[in-house]
Amino acid sequence: MSKSTSTGTSTRTTRLLDLAIGAAAVRAADPGGLRFTERQLYYETCRVLSPAAPLLRRVPGTPPPALRLPSFTRALNARGRETVPGLLPSAPPQATPADLARSRPSEPDLYDYGLPRLLLCQDRSIAAMLLANHVHLEAACPVLAAPDALPLAPLLLAALERADGATVHVLHDASPEGVQLPARVRAALGPVPGVRVGSLGLVPRHAAALRLPSGRGPAPGPAAGADWPAALRPREAAWLARGRFAQVAAVPPARLVRTVLRLTRGPRPPRDSMWGELNGLRTAGFMTWPTA
């Protein structure tokens, strides 16, 4: 291939990716101008580049992404992040538990009341996205990034205990590390009476039902499975044991917001949401998926 031909092909590819990113940004922000993360934009771009995806949405599976992440990053850098409406900046670290313990909130009596629910996110950027879209206000549920919030500050623990029946919701990837997070949260809470830890997902069967793109990382060690939830099915455990993963960021932003609101606020009339047909949460905190 001549140098001029190679240059022309590269230019066309760059132009195609630029158009795909623009279309993906419009879709990610719909409805109502949602804010979204760079990784969410990446997965939305993959959907734009997969025109057959809508035809296969009822066929369970975890296909590979249509676009390599480095190619997307180069295209986004060439376009300029500032040209993408709705794209959030990289999420800064939240206040650490020590910071929370040292400082009182602007409302002096905030922690004097019971806190019936709290949402912990494995991914800092997902926590920032939910906050940017005011999920914490609509659900009356604080949203924190687990890496920064654990162990929880004593003030938060006291507020959860005071609520008498509080739930700490955990939103995590379908990954070897993600499925262990609810157990880590339970251990970090310690013996707090009346506080329940519930997983909102993802687990591999959610990822397959939603046809989320999946990746592959290093396979976990042989002992890793001992810490995985008993509710995992054998084929899910085998999927994770191969180092496979699907990220919460792969869920379309609007669907993610609807689902988190629905599950953190409690029962609501049926809506078109990511887990609209679920019967509820298992006692252990795992979501059940309708049998195909």
Predicted regions, residues:
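Nucleic-acid enzyme cleavage-core boundary/entry regions
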Residues: 1-166, 176-292
